[in-house]
Amino acid sequence: MSSPFLWRFLSFTQKYRGTLLAVSSVGLFAANISYHVAPEQTFRKLYQGWSKGEPVQLTAKLQGLFQEVLEETHMGVTSSYVPFSAFGFHPVSAGIPWLPSGCLIGIPFNYNDTEQDGVGIADRVLLINGKEVDWSSDAGTHLRQALNLSLDAQKFSLAREVFYAQGNSPIIQASAAPVCLSGICLSSVAIKQLLGLYSGPILLRGVYNMAVVVLGFAGYFLCSDAVSQWLDYQSDRKVAAVSKSYATGGIEFYEKILAQNRILRTLMGKQGETMYSPSGNLFPNDYLRLKNAPYTSRRDRIKNALLQME
C-alpha cells in the first residue's frame, strides 16, 4: 500500500519541484532572520538582565558610553540602535538598523565598572558548576582582572556589534542556508540530466540522491561557517580602522576573553576542558564545524592592522 503513495509523492515533487524549492528557501530564510526582524519580542526576552524580579535598567553612564561610540563611529541614524541591559559579560546584538524594529544592543551590567575604576565585579555573586567564585582566591583574582575592561576595550566591543548590524550581517548569514539549498538542488538536477540518470535504474538515482544530501549538508556547514567567520573579521577590521584607540581596545578585548576562558577551563574541570582549548579559544561543538573565528586569529589580525596604521 505504501508503493502507490510513494509513486504519487515522487510524481508530485517532480511536477512542483520548482515551487517546493522556492517555498523551502523562503522558509529557511524566514526562520533564520525571524528574531532579527522582531528583536524586541524574541531576542530581548532571552538576554534581558534581571535583578530581584525586575528588568535591570541601563544606567546613564552606559547610555552615554553607547552614544559616544555611535558618534565616534559616525553612525548616521543613531535612533536605529537601542541599547539595553543584558546578562552575561559580553555585548550581544540582534536586529537590522533600517527596519522599523531597529537593532538592539545588549550591554552587560559589569560595563558600569572599568579597569581604571578598580572596582570590577567583585560585589557580584558568580556561580560556576554550582559553586560561588571566591574573588579573593588566586583564580578569582585573575578572573576578576580578566573581566574588567578598559574604556577602549568596552568601546571596541560595542562598536563591533554596531558595525555587525550596520553591514547587514544578519541578512547575509541568514541567506547562507537558502542559497546552499538552491545551489545543491539545481546542480543535482543538472548533473542528473547530464549523466542520463532520469532514465536509469531507480536504485542508482536513490544512491545518487543520498550522496547529494550528504554532500549538501557538508557544503552548507562549510559555507555557513566561512560566511560567519568572514563577517566576524569584517566587523573587527571596520572597528579597528576607526582609530588607534579602538584597535588597541580590540587587542585587549580579545586577550581578556582568552584569559577568561583559560581561567574558566580550570575552574570548570572536565567540562571546561571540553569547552575551551589551552589557548582560550572555544572548542567546536562537533568536528565538522567552526562557526566563529578563533579569538587568537581575530586578535592577531587587529595587531597587524594596528602595525599598518603606525
Curated annotation (Swiss-Prot):
Keyword Lyase carried by entry: no
Name this polypeptide is given: Transmembrane protein 177
InterPro entries: TMEM177
GO cellular component, one term: mitochondrial inner membrane
Record membrane topology: Multi-pass membrane protein
Main location: mitochondrion
The gene coding this protein: tmem177
Lineage: Eukaryota, Metazoa, Chordata, Craniata, Vertebrata
Stretches assigned to the Mitochondrial intermembrane side: 39-170, 223-310
Family the UniProt entry places it in: Belongs to the TMEM177 family.
Protein's job: Plays a role in the early steps of cytochrome c oxidase subunit II (MT-CO2/COX2) maturation and is required for the stabilization of COX20 and the newly synthesized MT-CO2/COX2 protein.
Keyword terms, alphabetized: Membrane, Mitochondrion, Mitochondrion inner membrane, Transmembrane, Transmembrane helix
Keyword Mitochondrion included in the entry's annotation: yes
Coiled coil, from the record: none
